[in-house]
């Protein structure tokens, strides 16, 4: 199945706050620049690319010199407003160095749930892609209250990236995180932790292996990534979870190399291949 990834034409790349930011709250410019180069080169190769990027609140905290993520809704939305503007400025700068035009698309759950507005989003994304533009999608944190409280089914950008992948009928969703893939135990505490190379069904046993929430500036944990993977598999789409510290790993994935965990449903008897 990995070999078939070479033929993927339309890609959705999701990058999380933990990949865009250092643990000390500063922006990881090196990673962002590499990401811009990789995605621009995929465009040069003839691929269609959509970037789903978190980071508005994390970048906003950095811009406003906040060491702790705010907890009140008005403060979170204010920080997101500043951060989203700064984030797009950074992306535009780095993508511009490679001659790649980007466009901002901010979504909320009601927009993707309502048929007419959902179709408008699909048409807009298709129009951007047809013009060779890389859409940069984020949830509109400035108005999306429920996501900021972590109580909605929309969840965070992990699930949003899966929804976007379905909307544009992407061939592959690549989720860049701060972990190499899905493990049977926490690799940070268990040196013998085993990574799944492929998962064909999200079972209760798989869910039980997932831990809690993610970084202090982000919202996602392994459970949200499993929810996104489940959404993709229900839509007969593929998702790969891998480490985003070096975005050039995307090139290796597109060559069919065994990197990260591939989530893909199979009709035959389920099996979980592992890498040791």
Swiss-Prot record:
GO terms for cellular component: cytosol. Its main location: cytoplasm. ATP binds at residues 14, 177-178, 219-225. Keywords: Amino-acid biosynthesis, ATP-binding, Cytoplasm, Kinase, Nucleotide-binding, Proline biosynthesis, Transferase. Coiled coil: none annotated. It catalyses: L-glutamate + ATP = L-glutamyl 5-phosphate + ADP. Pathway: Amino-acid biosynthesis; L-proline biosynthesis; L-glutamate 5-semialdehyde from L-glutamate: step 1/2. This is Glutamate 5-kinase. It comes from Listeria monocytogenes serotype 4b (strain CLIP80459).
């Amino acid at each position: 199945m990995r070999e078939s990834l070479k033929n993927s034409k339309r890609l959705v790349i999701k990058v999380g706050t933990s990949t865009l930011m250092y643990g000390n709250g500063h922006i990881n410019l090196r990673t962002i620049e590499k990401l811009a180069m990789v995605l621009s080169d995929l465009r040069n190769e003839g691929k269609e690319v959509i970037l789903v990027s978190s980071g508005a609140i994390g970048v906003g905290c950095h811009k406003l010199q906040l060491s702790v993520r705010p907890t009140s809704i008005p403060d979170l939305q204010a920080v997101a407003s500043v951060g989203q503007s700064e984030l797009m400025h950074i992306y535009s700068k780095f993508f511009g160095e490679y001659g790649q035009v980007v466009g901002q698309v901010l979504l909320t759950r009601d927009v993707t749930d309502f048929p007419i507005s959902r179709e408008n989003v699909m048409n807009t994304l298709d129009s951007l892609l047809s013009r060779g533009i890389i859409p940069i999608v984020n949830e509109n944190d400035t108005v999306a209250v429920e996501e900021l409280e972590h109580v909605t089914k929309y969840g965070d950008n992990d699930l949003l990236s899966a929804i976007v992948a379905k909307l544009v009928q992407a061939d592959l969703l690549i989720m860049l995180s701060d972990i190499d893939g899905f493990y049977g135990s926490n690799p940070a505490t268990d040196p013998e932790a085993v990574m799944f190379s492929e998962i064909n069904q999200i079972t209760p046993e798989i869910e039980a292996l997932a831990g809690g929430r993610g970084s202090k500036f982000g919202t996602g944990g392994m459970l949200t990534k499993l929810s996104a993977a489940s959404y993709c598999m229900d839509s007969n789409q593929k998702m790969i979870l891998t480490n985003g510290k070096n975005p050039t790993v995307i090139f290796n994935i597109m060559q069919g190399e065994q990197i990260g965990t591939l989530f893909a449903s199979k009709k035959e008897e389920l099996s979980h291949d592992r890498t040791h």
